[in-house]
């Protein structure tokens, strides 16, 4: 299967990612979910957490972003993720990602 879906992670300052993908996983308000090409259209509120963008069928090549929450629009052909903050954590260890997530959550709680 060679189908892909266009993924964009958009912040107020830039497009953090624009790439074709085989699958994307992210944290919605009701839990983790995945999106494949030809997905049914939907709009979902996102929690702070990881967005994993899988590039190949074996799910070995991925881009991982830590986002501050936001909203995603999904159609059969594209996924737009709008967020205030998107940090590329693809090459970080799990411990480093956990630290960044805690820092982000603290920043978000301080803003409220």
From Swiss-Prot:
Query: What keywords tag this UniProt record?
Result: ATP synthesis, Cell inner membrane, Cell membrane, CF(1), Hydrogen ion transport, Ion transport, Membrane, Transport
UniProt xrefs under PANTHER family: ATP SYNTHASE DELTA/EPSILON CHAIN, ATP SYNTHASE EPSILON CHAIN, CHLOROPLASTIC
HAMAP family annotated for this entry?
ATP_synth_epsil_bac
Q: How does it sit in the membrane?
A: Peripheral membrane protein
| Pfam families in the record | ATP-synt_DE_N
Q: What does this protein do?
A: Produces ATP from ADP in the presence of a proton gradient across the membrane.
Question: A GO molecular function for this record?
Answer: ATP binding
Protein's name according to its UniProt entry: ATP synthase epsilon chain
Protein's cellular compartments: Cell inner membrane
Primary site of residence: membrane
Coiled-coil segments on the chain, per record = none
Family per record: Belongs to the ATPase epsilon chain family.
Top-rank taxon? Bacteria
Q: Could you name the Gene Ontology cellular component terms for this entry?
A: plasma membrane; proton-transporting ATP synthase complex
**How does it associate, per the subunit comment?**
F-type ATPases have 2 components, CF(1) - the catalytic core - and CF(0) - the membrane proton channel. CF(1) has five subunits: alpha(3), beta(3), gamma(1), delta(1), epsilon(1). CF(0) has three main subunits: a, b and c.
User: Which InterPro entries is this protein grouped with?
Assistant: ATP_synth_F1_dsu/esu, ATP_synth_F1_dsu/esu_N, ATPsynth_dsu/esu_N
């Amino acid at each position: 299967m060679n189908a892909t879906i266009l993924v964009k992670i958009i912040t107020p300052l830039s497009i953090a990612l624009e790439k074709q993908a085989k699958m994307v996983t992210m944290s919605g308000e009701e839990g983790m979910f995945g999106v494949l090409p030809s997905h049914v259209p939907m709009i979902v509120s996102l929690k702070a957490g990881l967005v994993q963008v899988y590039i190949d069928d074996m799910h070995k090549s991925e881009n991982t972003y830590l986002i501050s929450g936001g909203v995603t629009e999904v159609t059969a052909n594209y996924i737009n993720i709008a967020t205030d903050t998107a940090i590329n954590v693809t090459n970080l260890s799990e411990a480093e990602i956990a630290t960044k997530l805690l820092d982000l959550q603290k920043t978000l709680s301080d803003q409220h």
